[in-house]
Amino acid sequence: MHAENSFVIDDWYPVGALAETVSGRKYHTRILGTEIWYQLADGTVSAGLADNTAELASKSIYGLLWVSLSDNPRDVIAIPEFAEADRRVVSAGSIRVATSGLRVIENFLDMAHFPFVHTDILGAEPLTEVAAYDVEIDEAADEIRAVNCRFPQPKGSAAASEPVEMQYVYRIARPFIAILYKTCVIDANRLDVLGLFVQPVDQESSIAHTIMCYLDDINTDKQLRDFQQRIFGQDIMILINQVPKALPLNPRHETPVRADALSSAYRRWLNDRNVTFGTTRG
């Protein structure tokens, strides 16, 4: 049994996009309610507690700067696609959201809202049904995957020129990290990778760092960024109006609907790992 919140304390958290970080400038932010600083200088990341009583582990990978509060953090998750030379790694920005980071992740996993929130982009009426998909627990990696996900989308990516039934694989790698592998319209034999890396600022606020790892020789970085920011911008009003802001982990709050199978698995997974930060059990 995990000690309360050890599963989140012993992890790494993004604090900024590498492309948007000014070298030599000292930044101040919070992780899990703890005030910290970080800096990029001569290609090296450094970080510490805001009161300068301790240095913190830090690194740069996947287009982000990362910091851990732990003296012995586990490894950063592996995303092999980032090492593929023909992929574009583009930041879609770091957006502050006035809700628990776990809420941000759960919203990312939800396909049911596509036709109603992302109308004529990720979905459209009357095609509103979420087809059955499979949820798998990878015991060795301690991750959740949803496979065989599919949804008809009018414009499933910035590169899409016509409607297509997008194929999705969701990977919940850590409580505050979810990776989406989706149909690549440029290369049918490979998948685009969209990473949502959430920085839990405190119990009820977070910063969503989104990184695209795409096979796209059509769009500029700005066009890729604009497309993804439009999608996230449509989600903001939903996220900030959710009550409570913390993610409910009491089983009575779960809705046993097929479309919510991944969300239910995510909540149980958090509960089983004694994650209480950013949650409520009321």
UniProtKB/Swiss-Prot annotation:
Q: Show the Pfam families listed in the entry.
A: VanA_C
Q: Quick check: keyword Oxidoreductase in the entry?
A: yes
- PANTHER family from the xrefs? 3-KETOSTEROID-9-ALPHA-MONOOXYGENASE, OXYGENASE COMPONENT, IRON-SULFUR DOMAIN CONTAINING PROTEIN
- Give the UniProt record's GO annotations in the biological process aspect: alkaloid catabolic process
Q: Which InterPro entries is this protein grouped with?
A: Cholesterol_7-desaturase (IPR050584), VanA_C_cat (IPR044043)
Which residues, if any, are the signal sequence? none
Enzyme category, top tier: oxidoreductase
Reported function: Involved in the caffeine degradation, which is the essential first step for assimilating the carbon and nitrogen in caffeine. Probably catalyzes the N7-demethylation of 7-methylxanthine to produce xanthine and formaldehyde.
E.C. number, please? 1.14.13.128
User: Molecular function terms in GO for this entry?
Assistant: oxidoreductase activity
Keywords noted in UniProt: Alkaloid metabolism, NAD, Oxidoreductase
Substrates-to-products reaction catalysed: 7-methylxanthine + NADPH + O2 + H(+) = xanthine + formaldehyde + NADP(+) + H2O; 7-methylxanthine + NADH + O2 + H(+) = xanthine + formaldehyde + NAD(+) + H2O
Q: What is this protein called?
A: Probable methylxanthine N7-demethylase NdmC
